[in-house]
């Protein structure tokens, strides 16, 4: 599935996110949104970051992208 981004889409996203997306206490992702019921802008928590993986941990726990031919299974009958 390929998404095609038009210049108007990119401009709209940039306008919404510019100076509007915040990280609080290195844990909470906050976005200011317009509440139509109260006719006011209010903060909305998009989520919480519970864990970060450092480069050292990523290298130690990384899975290999390739396998040797002896590890590959074959569906061919002999």
UniProtKB/Swiss-Prot annotation:
Gene Ontology CC terms: host cell nucleus
Coiled coil region boundaries: none
InterPro entries: Baculo_LEF-10
UniProtKB keywords: DNA replication, Host nucleus, Transcription, Transcription regulation, Viral DNA replication
Chief site of localization: host cell
Location of the protein in the cell: Host nucleus
GO biological process, one term: DNA replication
Purpose: Plays an essential role in viral DNA replication.
Family: Belongs to the baculoviridae LEF-10 family.
Protein name, as recorded: Late expression factor 10
Lineage: Viruses, Viruses incertae sedis, Naldaviricetes, Lefavirales, Baculoviridae
């Amino acid at each position: 599935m390929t998404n095609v981004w038009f210049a108007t889409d990119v401009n709209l996203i940039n306008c919404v996110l510019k100076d509007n997306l915040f990280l609080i206490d290195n844990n909470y992702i906050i976005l200011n949104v317009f509440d139509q019921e109260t006719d006011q802008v209010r903060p909305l928590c998009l989520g919480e970051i519970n864990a970060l993986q450092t480069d050292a941990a990523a290298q130690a726990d990384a899975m290999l992208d390739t396998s040797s031919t002896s590890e590959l299974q074959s569906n061919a009958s002999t």
